[in-house]
Amino acid sequence: MIGVCQLHLRIPESHSLKEKRHILRKVIDRVRHRFNVSVSEVGDNDLWQRSQIGICTVGNDRRFVNSSLDKIIDFIEKMYLADVIEKEIEIITF
């Protein structure tokens, strides 16, 4: 199973692209180190108060993969650095 999640974030404390990248780096690094998943900014690169990040994880159980993505989303929301305004989750079976 491959779990893919795309999050649309609003970053209210950002007033420039430099501040946005600084905040995103914190979010991405903390998620990557805590959950051992792949994370990257995948959209809205030139908007200073919005971003899209992609998260990918793999596992052999659908419930585990889905639960992992839910925990990551909850973790990001509880950091209070960015607001999750939209989320898309897809579980791919191969």
What are these regions (language model features)?
Residues 23-27, 68:
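Hydrophobic alpha-helical membrane-association signature
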Residues 20:
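C-terminal binding/interaction regions
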Residues 8-10, 36, 74:
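A structural boundary/capping signal
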Residues 30-43, 66:
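Amphipathic alpha-helical assembly/interaction segments
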Residues 2, 40-61, 90-94:
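Short, charge-patterned binding micro-sites
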Residues 58-94:
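C-terminal structural segments of small proteins and small subunits
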Residues 3-13:
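Short glycine-/aliphatic-rich beta-strand segments at the starts of folded cytosolic domains
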Residues 11-16, 59-61:
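A generic structural motif
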